[in-house]
């Protein structure tokens, strides 16, 4: 199994699939916002940024997947973004399941002054909703819970890919006597 993931990470198609899946999920988020008129909250915006990190990791890995530098850089960026996204989604689920006046998200995002994404791209990163509101659900789970599952999947996948990198490749053929 590890050799499969190592082989997949050494090819461009696996990285492009990672980037494509993140892009599709970003487009789905925009459909929910503009097509279904759901209002994104601060945590939703942060989760979009984390998903953008996974998209960026897929692009980095696709640049030169046979190079260990670009491969490891893509894995580390993707794993960091997916773990951060998982932690953000976990906090978002906590806001929804335990609403209280002292358990609320901030109204405005706290981006660095050198990277104010909410001012540069307000159509993507401007929050207008409340984190504790459940505006949409599917199969009894809120969107934040589905996002938690999504980031857990990305985290597990990228952790397996990272572990597969230290595995030595299989020899081409084995000889009993030399």
UniProtKB/Swiss-Prot annotation:
The UniProt entry, under SUPFAM superfamilies, shows: DsbB-like
| Membrane side Cytoplasmic: residue ranges | 1-14, 66-72, 165-178
Q: Where in the cell is it found?
A: Cell inner membrane
- Per the record, the major location class is membrane
List, in alphabetical order, the Gene Ontology terms for molecular function in this entry: electron transfer activity; protein-disulfide reductase activity
Q: Which UniProt keywords apply?
A: Cell inner membrane, Cell membrane, Chaperone, Disulfide bond, Electron transport, Membrane, Oxidoreductase, Redox-active center, Transmembrane, Transmembrane helix, Transport
Q: Quick one: signal sequence residues? A: none
Record's GO cellular component terms: plasma membrane
Function of the protein: Required for disulfide bond formation in some periplasmic proteins. Acts by oxidizing the DsbA protein.
What is the protein name stated in its UniProt record? Answer: Disulfide bond formation protein B
Please name the source species. Mannheimia succiniciproducens (strain KCTC 0769BP / MBEL55E)
Q: Which gene encodes it?
A: dsbB
């Amino acid at each position: 199994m590890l050799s499969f993931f190592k082989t997949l990470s050494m090819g461009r198609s696996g990285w492009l699939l990672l980037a494509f899946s993140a892009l599709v999920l970003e487009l789905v988020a925009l459909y929910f916002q503009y097509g279904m008129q759901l209002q994104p909250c601060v945590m939703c915006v942060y989760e979009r940024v984390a998903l953008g990190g996974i998209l960026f990791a897929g692009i980095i890995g696709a640049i030169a997947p046979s190079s260990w530098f670009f491969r490891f850089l893509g894995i580390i960026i993707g794993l960091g973004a997916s773990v951060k996204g998982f932690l953000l989604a976990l906090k978002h689920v906590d806001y929804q399941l335990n609403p209280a006046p002292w358990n609320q998200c901030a109204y405005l995002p706290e981006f660095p002054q050198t990277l104010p994404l909410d001012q540069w791209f307000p159509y993507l990163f401007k929050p207008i909703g409340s984190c504790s509101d459940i505006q949409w659900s599917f199969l009894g789970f809120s969107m934040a819970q589905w996002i938690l599952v999504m980031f857990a999947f990305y985290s597990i996948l990228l952790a397996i890919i990272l572990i597969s990198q230290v595995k030595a490749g299989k020899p081409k053929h084995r000889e009993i006597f030399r």
